[in-house]
């Protein structure tokens, strides 16, 4: 299973989230998932909201275009980005 793939015009990502990091960043591969560090704590959905905002900024889409499909309450997530305007190089290199 790939960490990133296209499905029609959408981009799907399998992510491993590291909350409470010192800065937001795409760390690299973590097994078969893409590891993303975010500064938000994993409390009351703050990490998910922050992750959506961060990915939306990277892909130049609205926050509502980033959908957590699986893993709402865990570190392992599957995220769909609807019609991304831009795909960061770190992610583009992983697309199958």
UniProtKB/Swiss-Prot annotation:
Q: Supply the name of the protein.
A: UPF0235 protein VC_0458
Query: What is the species of this protein?
Result: Vibrio cholerae serotype O1 (strain ATCC 39315 / El Tor Inaba N16961)
The protein's matches in HAMAP family, at most eight in alphabetical order, are given as: UPF0235 (MF_00634)
Where, if anywhere, are coiled coils annotated? none
Q: Which InterPro entries match?
A: DUF167 (IPR003746), YggU-like_sf (IPR036591)
Q: Which family does it belong to?
A: Belongs to the UPF0235 family.
Q: Which Pfam families match?
A: DUF167
The UniProt entry's GO CC annotations, sorted and at most eight, read: cytoplasm
């Amino acid at each position: 299973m790939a960490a990133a793939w296209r499905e029609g015009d959408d981009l799907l990502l399998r992510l491993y989230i590291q909350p409470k990091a010192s800065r937001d960043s795409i760390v690299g591969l973590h097994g078969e998932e893409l590891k993303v560090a975010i500064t938000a704590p994993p409390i009351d959905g703050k990490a998910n909201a922050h992750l959506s905002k961060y990915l939306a900024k990277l892909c130049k889409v609205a926050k509502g275009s980033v959908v957590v499909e699986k893993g709402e309450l865990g570190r392992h997530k599957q995220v769909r980005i609807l019609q991304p305007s831009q795909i960061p190089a770190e992610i583009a290199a992983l697309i199958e």
